[in-house]
């Protein structure tokens, strides 16, 4: 092959690689700016509270509510069975908090989109603090109540595969509470299903079930934890 042609081809490849790298960096920076405008931030350290109370499914979120016990949605749990796995607070690292098998699944008997799962205490893959689930996470406490205009945050795994299982936090306010339904304006995306809705004290108010209308809607929905729902959850927390 002509030596000059080889040199030119290698130079062109180097330029293309450089341009591709720059383009990827620009896209990532643009995405981060867009998230910032929506009051969404990437969590840097998921080994501290409240972030290590959140767990990831392959395409959704859950959170810890007691010993070996997590909450998510029915529309999430329907795709899982006993023996399937969840990951505790990953942040681009699948083993950050350990990987655990599901031991049981209990769906709320009403129409509300809530499911309680009990988890095997010993990890399939250890977390940063060993093989014990409860050593690697911290359970959330229930909020006493909530009202319209309260500040809230949502922590979870939006678009988990696309975002390489990085954890994100979005902030907003409560717009409406009616019976078991809570509406809020914090930004969410697919993958946030099962995320905790937290008050300013990091106490859990409810569980995200989805957006209302288009993706990224500013009017989103969660199941509000009424006394009846709290009682159901409490009965399924492992003692």
From Swiss-Prot:
GO cellular component labels: extracellular region
GO BP terms: proteolysis
Location(s) in or outside the cell: Secreted
Protease among keywords: yes
InterPro entries per the UniProt record, alphabetical: Peptidase_S1_PA, Peptidase_S1_PA_chymotrypsin, Peptidase_S1B, Peptidase_S1B_tx, Trypsin_dom, V8_his_AS
Top EC class of this enzyme: hydrolase
Active-site residues, record numbering mapped to chain: 75 (charge relay system), 113 (charge relay system), 193 (charge relay system)
Position of the signal peptide: 1-36
Disulphide connectivity of cysteines: none
GO molecular function, one term: serine-type endopeptidase activity
Keywords for the protein's UniProt record, in alphabetical order: Hydrolase, Protease, Secreted, Serine protease, Signal
Pfam family, one: Trypsin
EC number: 3.4.21.-
PROSITE patterns, alphabetized: V8_HIS (PS00672)
Signal is among the record's keywords: yes
Family: Belongs to the peptidase S1B family.
Protein name: Serine protease SplC
Organism: Staphylococcus aureus (strain MRSA252)
């Amino acid at each position: 092959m002509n030596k000059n042609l080889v040199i030119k081809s290698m130079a062109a490849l180097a330029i293309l690689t450089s341009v591709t790298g720059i383009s990827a960096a620009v896209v990532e920076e643009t995405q981060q700016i867009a998230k910032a405008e929506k009051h969404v931030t990437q969590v840097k350290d998921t080994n501290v509270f409240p972030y290590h109370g959140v767990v990831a499914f392959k395409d959704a979120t859950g959170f810890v509510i007691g010993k070996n016990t997590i909450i998510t949605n029915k529309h999430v749990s329907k795709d899982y069975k006993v023996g399937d796995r969840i990951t505790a607070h990953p942040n681009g690292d699948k083993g950050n908090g350990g990987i655990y098998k599901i031991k049981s699944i209990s769906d709320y008997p009403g129409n509300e989109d809530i499911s309680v799962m009990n988890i095997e205490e010993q990890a399939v893959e250890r977390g940063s603090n060993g093989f014990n689930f409860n050593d690697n996470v911290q359970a959330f406490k229930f909020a006493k109540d909530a009202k319209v205009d309260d500040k809230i945050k949502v922590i979870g795994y939006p678009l988990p595969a696309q975002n390489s299982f990085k954890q994100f936090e979005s902030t907003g306010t409560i717009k409406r509470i009616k019976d078991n339904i809570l509406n809020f304006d914090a930004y969410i995306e697919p993958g946030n299903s099962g995320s905790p809705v937290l008050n300013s004290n990091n106490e859990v108010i409810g569980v995200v079930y989805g957006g209302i209308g288009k993706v990224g809607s500013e009017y989103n929905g969660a199941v509000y934890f009424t006394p009846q729902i709290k009682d159901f959850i409490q009965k399924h927390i492992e003692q």
